[in-house]
Amino acid sequence: MMLDTLANALSTIMNNEVRGKKQCVIYPSSKLIVAVLDTLKRSGYIGDFELIDDGRGGKIVVNLLGRINKIGVIKPRYPVKKNEFEAWEREYLPSRDVGLLIVSTPKGVMTHREAKEKGLGGVLLAYVY
């Protein structure tokens, strides 16, 4: 029984990155996982990914590029205002301008830099560097 599918997906990606694999399979799939993977793809941390409907919750095959040093979920999922991102960057990222925080906003899942540009707050989901 999986309680947090996003945490399971990100730990699968991290484990396969450490082992030097080129692909990994994430299951079950969800809209949130697909949105987070799309954000990681736009930021250049992973390659393409493919959704496979197997009739049991679906799978996602992710092509890895070897650019992730650390990825993880942020628990509990803290609410963040548009002017509070710097404090959370210091908490979860190793240095300034290195890595991303992934945020769920009313306009969709995006990086903390995109949320700052658009003047949006949201809920912290994950970090990657």
From Swiss-Prot:
One of its GO terms (cellular component) is ribosome. Keywords: Ribonucleoprotein, Ribosomal protein, RNA-binding, rRNA-binding. GO terms for molecular function: rRNA binding; structural constituent of ribosome. One of its GO terms (biological process) is translation. InterPro entries: Ribosomal_uS8, Ribosomal_uS8_CS, Ribosomal_uS8_sf. It comes from the Archaea. PANTHER family: 40S RIBOSOMAL PROTEIN S15A. Part of the 30S ribosomal subunit. One of the primary rRNA binding proteins, it binds directly to 16S rRNA central domain where it helps coordinate assembly of the platform of the 30S subunit. Belongs to the universal ribosomal protein uS8 family. This is Small ribosomal subunit protein uS8. The lineage of its organism: Archaea, Thermoproteota, Thermoprotei, Thermofilales, Thermofilaceae. The gene is rps8.
